[in-house]
Amino acid sequence: DWDDLRLGLTRDRDAWVADLKATQLGGTLRLPDSPRVQPIAARLTRVDLKALSGDAASTRPPEAEVPDLADEARTDPREVPALDLDVEQVQWGQADLGRLRLVTRARPDGLDLAELSLQGPLGGANGSGSWTQSADGSGAFGAPVTRLAVEGKTADLGELLRRLDFASAVEHAPAEATMSADWPGGPGDFALARLDGRVGFEVGAGGLLEVEPGVGRML
């Protein structure tokens, strides 16, 4: 749900243009008449992911209880509009995560993730990928599959975790993370239990804040 939403609509030559103002976000949205040809263009000044997520994380089933895709509605990526998204400031509550660029392009079997970039005061991430209908040996389209390759860096892992509301005993430690993986279904079907690929994580030299003795022995 969006709080205090104000919406204004105007008609352009070949698109509707929406002016959005809410507690969680603000900006403009251009909805073309042919979104597979012209992408939906979103130019947002800010998006608060914490406010948008609400209680979704607390109600999501644990990994062991992730339902089979056969029991879920499957979206055909060949029917999903292309998107050109620019967010000046992505927030998690009061934390500034940086500027987000996300661009998808239509292809015959689905969508390409042509650009994914988040650059902020504590680091950034870049990625690419696709969401397509897989083809069998006869050339017929089968189930959808999502592929994603992402690289991320931060100059201070502990501070980043704390800004995201995670407890962290690490300070002044740089970190790098990489992922190259695919999973059945769409981007929203991501789950560790479905993942096929590689995930890497490296933490550089840093310091530990005061921790409990048991935690210190473990480290």
Q: Where would I find each of the regions flagged by the language model?
A:
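N-terminal mature ectodomain segment of secretory-pathway/periplasmic proteins
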Residues: L9-A18
